[in-house]
């Protein structure tokens, strides 16, 4: 999208994303604003986002630090668990609908297992980043940079929520003529 700070503009530009995010909210009970804030942080809404490669001898591209990729930056093992739970073929981390559903699925499971509120984007993001086990152990506590990022995700979710409240009726009434 041409902007990533205004969820209404994102959805106006990419209406299919609105439908996918709304479907995820209905299915997993995770607010649109929370899912969108996490995806913004993880990939800046770039479909084929991947972590940088390490450098061998300081300049030769080497292995990536993690298997994370796509809008949701889902790592291989967690993506496989999602596929086993969800079923179906032709699911891709580079597809927005699949990625936002993954984020909803993961955060719903986190909410159920750890009791984190679906509106607490900060805590959900910490569990998303560290894994549920890491969150339970408090691995994020020794990562001040991650706490700063989680605060940023919460602020973005809050901002998206205010914006979304102002445009969701209009988005819901949109008709597409062929």
Model-derived regions: residue spans:
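Catalytic glycan-binding domains that act on GlcNAc-containing polysaccharides
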Residues: 2-171
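Gram-negative outer-membrane assembly/targeting C-terminal domains
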Residues: 170-178
């Amino acid at each position: 999208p041409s902007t990533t700070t205004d969820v209404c503009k994102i959805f106006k530009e990419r209406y299919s994303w609105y439908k996918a995010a709304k479907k995820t909210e209905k299915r997993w009970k995770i607010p649109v604003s929370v899912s969108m804030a996490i995806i913004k942080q993880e990939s800046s809404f770039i479909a084929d986002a991947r972590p940088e490669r390490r450098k061998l001898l300081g300049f030769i591209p080497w292995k990536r630090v993690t298997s994370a990729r796509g809008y949701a930056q889902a790592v291989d093992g967690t993506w496989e668990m999602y596929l086993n739970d969800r079923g179906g073929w032709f699911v891709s981390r580079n597809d927005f609908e699949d990625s936002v559903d993954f984020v909803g699925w993961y955060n719903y499971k986190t909410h159920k297992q750890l009791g984190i509120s679906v509106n607490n984007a900060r805590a959900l993001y910490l569990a998303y980043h560290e894994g549920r086990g890491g969150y339970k152990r408090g691995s994020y506590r020794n990562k001040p940079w991650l706490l700063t990022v989680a605060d940023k995700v919460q602020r973005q979710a809050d901002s998206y929520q205010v914006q979304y409240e102002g445009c969701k009726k209009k988005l819901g009434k949109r008709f597409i003529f062929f």
